[in-house]
Amino acid sequence: DCASGPCCRDCKFLEEGTICNMARGDDMDDYCNGKTCDCPRNPHKWPAP
């Protein structure tokens, strides 16, 4: 399925919902979608305090 990338392991796409980028600051975690080797950016942010 894939050769390399944050959502690729052993030439297979990682399962949908696998965290591929941990949250930093007000960002939320990014998750693999099970269809691409890239790590899709989560557009959502944590609400301001």
From Swiss-Prot:
Q: Which SUPFAM superfamilies match?
A: Blood coagulation inhibitor (disintegrin)
Keywords in alphabetical order = Cell adhesion impairing toxin, Disulfide bond, Hemostasis impairing toxin, Platelet aggregation inhibiting toxin, Secreted, Toxin
Q: Look up the domain of life of the source.
A: Eukaryota
| Tissue and organ distribution | Expressed by the venom gland.
Extra information: The disintegrin belongs to the short disintegrin subfamily.
Q: What does the subunit section of this Swiss-Prot or TrEMBL entry state?
A: Monomer (disintegrin).
The name of this protein is: Disintegrin pyramidin-B
Supply the source organism's classification. Answer: Eukaryota, Metazoa, Chordata, Craniata, Vertebrata
